[in-house]
A protein has these predicted regions:
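Short helical (or helix-break) motifs at transmembrane helix termini and adjacent helical loops
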Residues: 131, 163-178, 391-400
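Helix-coil boundary and interhelical linker segments in multi-pass alpha-helical membrane proteins
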Residues: 142-154, 440-444
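Alpha-helical transmembrane segments of multipass membrane proteins
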Residues: 17-21, 48-49, 118-122, 143-144, ...
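Membrane-embedded alpha-helical segments and adjacent helix-loop junctions characteristic
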Residues: 55-146, 305-398
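Hydrophobic transmembrane alpha-helices of multi-pass small-molecule transporters
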Residues: 1-79, 196-206, 213-337, 477
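C-terminal transmembrane helix pair
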Residues: 10, 182-198, 202, 343, ...
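Central hydrophobic cores of alpha-helical transmembrane segments
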Residues: 135-141, 159, 261-269
């Protein structure tokens, strides 16, 4: 098979960017409902056409690569659907309303953003999962922030920054384990070495969030009172429902599978719906049914579809609205289409051609790290999956780092700096799509405020430029 040139390989990426630009410009937030997916499929068709007509790639090879890509994210799709049900159950079961009710009274608005980042960081370190952190405590923090008058971009940015700090440094994180294993670096050696770039990034982020918090004009206490009163009117606020996040935390600490943990958490929240919020379920069920049938129908509708309960204020009505598993379907569809594109580019040799282009710029330390960062970012854009990007980046540069005498921990750190934390900043990446869907905040809205994620690759390059704590394992040949 002939290998396409980097210029030809970049053509589908350029076409995708142009198509997405006009699609988002025309459809806005509705682009996720089908427009973006069509853009990805059209670009996939372009890749396949180029590969089959000019480079001798068979459709069977392309199809096989696409199937492998989709198989690789199958567990993520299941998690997404469960998260949709969990988010609805936590809201309508009174878990999130109770957390918000007490949270707005405990967390001072001046310290909210920095507290938001720190809380998510701690939870994510303990759980090893940014997705679980954002889908649980992140949703509650969004509600608290809105009640205190913060813009949703700032709130989501603080949540994303904290959650991905924890995801990056936690020994329980799958990306942390993957980056260390792919580069043959001991896990805790990898984690310790990441601190030289991770700590400056998170400290700068916390300073920015602190300044932003003190610059924020807090909502009138009467507005917060209206908010909390509205929650108390709609839901039965009780400490008993907080057993759900407590049990969830215990399961996570015991390293129970993410799918099992989320499923049990959802089931417990459903019990809370039945015990503490039966009136809410009857309202969701609507007229025509009563008794146990109404409760059963309410649970089914809540977990599977959208609900919109009327509250005392429009803001509160919007906050307590849920989308269930059905609300995740656009994201699932988008991920499937993104995997099609990644598979087609892989089968046609385009990803390999582009990544080899980055390898040419690896003559000195700074350029080697910069090329690794650029390659990781590109793969995140092209494959739409952080796991694939970590594997490809690590395998591609492993020999180069060894040849130049750089320690494997430098490659593992740079890979995480470039891939793990930037994945939620890309609208069509699995992480970007998921977090935007869970928080109900478009990726491009929270992107400017996700300071930790933006700073990490820049700090990584800067540290390489000054040569801080970078040694060669052997002399260069």
């Amino acid at each position: 098979m002939k290998i396409p040139s980097p210029l030809v390989s970049l053509l589908p990426v350029a076409v995708l960017v142009v198509l997405l630009f006009f699609t988002i410009r025309l459809l806005g937030a509705d682009a996720l409902g089908g427009g973006s997916q069509i853009c990805l499929l059209l670009t996939t068709a372009l890749c396949a056409a180029l590969g089959m007509s000019r480079y001798g790639v068979s459709w069977k090879d392309i199809e096989h690569a696409i199937i492998n890509n989709i198989a690789g994210v199958s567990s993520a799709l299941i998690i997404l659907l469960i998260i949709g049900a969990l988010s609805a159950a936590w809201m309508l079961g009174g878990v999130v309303p109770t957390l918000i009710y007490y949270g707005v009274q405990i967390i001072h608005p001046k310290f909210f953003l920095v507290s938001c980042c720190v809380i998510c960081a701690v939870v994510s370190v303990m759980t090893g999962s940014s997705w679980t952190t954002i889908a649980t405590i992140g949703i509650a923090l969004m509600g608290i922030g809105k009640a205190q008058g913060f813009e949703e971009g700032w709130i989501a940015g603080a949540i994303i920054s904290g959650a991905y700090f924890g995801d990056k440094v936690s020994p329980l994180s799958d990306t942390t384990i993957l980056a260390s294993s792919v580069t043959d670096t001991p896990l805790f050696t990898h984690i310790r070495y990441m601190m030289y770039t991770t700590v400056p990034s998170v400290v700068i982020s916390l300073v920015i969030f602190t300044i932003a918090g003190f610059s924020h004009e807090a909502s009138d206490s009467s507005q917060i009172a209206v908010f909390t009163t509205g929650l108390a009117e709609r839901f039965h606020i009780t400490f008993w429902v907080l057993l759900v996040p407590v049990v969830t935390g215990i399961l996570i600490a015991r390293k129970v599978s993410s799918i099992i943990t989320l499923f049990i958490s959802t089931a417990l929240a459903v019990v809370c719906m039945l015990v503490f919020q039966p009136d809410v379920l009857r309202e969701v069920a609507g007229d025509g049914v009563s008794g146990g049938e109404a409760l059963y129908k309410g649970v089914l509708l809540a977990l599977s579809g959208s609900t919109s309960l009327q509250a005392s204020t429009p803001a509160l009505t919007e906050l307590i609205a849920t989308r269930g598993m059905g609300g995740m379907m656009d994201t699932v569809w988008l991920i499937l289409c993104a995997m099609c594109l990644g598979g087609a580019m892989t089968a046609c040799g385009m990803l390999g051609s582009i990544t080899r282009m980055f390898v040419r710029f690896t003559h000195k330390l700074a350029s080697t790290v910069a090329a690794t960062v650029a390659s990781g970012l590109f793969l995140n854009l092209a494959t739409a999956d952080q796991y694939i990007s970590i594997i490809l980046t690590g395998n591609m540069f492993k020999g180069i780092y060894k040849k130049n005498g750089y320690e494997s921990r430098l490659l593992s750190r740079t890979t995480e700096d470039a891939v793990t934390v930037t994945s939620p900043l890309i609208p069509w990446n699995t992480c970007g799509m998921t977090q935007a869907t869970i928080l109900n905040v478009p990726t491009l809205v929270y992107l400017p405020y996700s300071f930790f994620n933006l700073l990490s690759p820049l700090i990584s390059i800067f540290v390489a430029c000054i040569g801080f704590k970078i040694v060669r394992s052997v002399k260069k040949d």
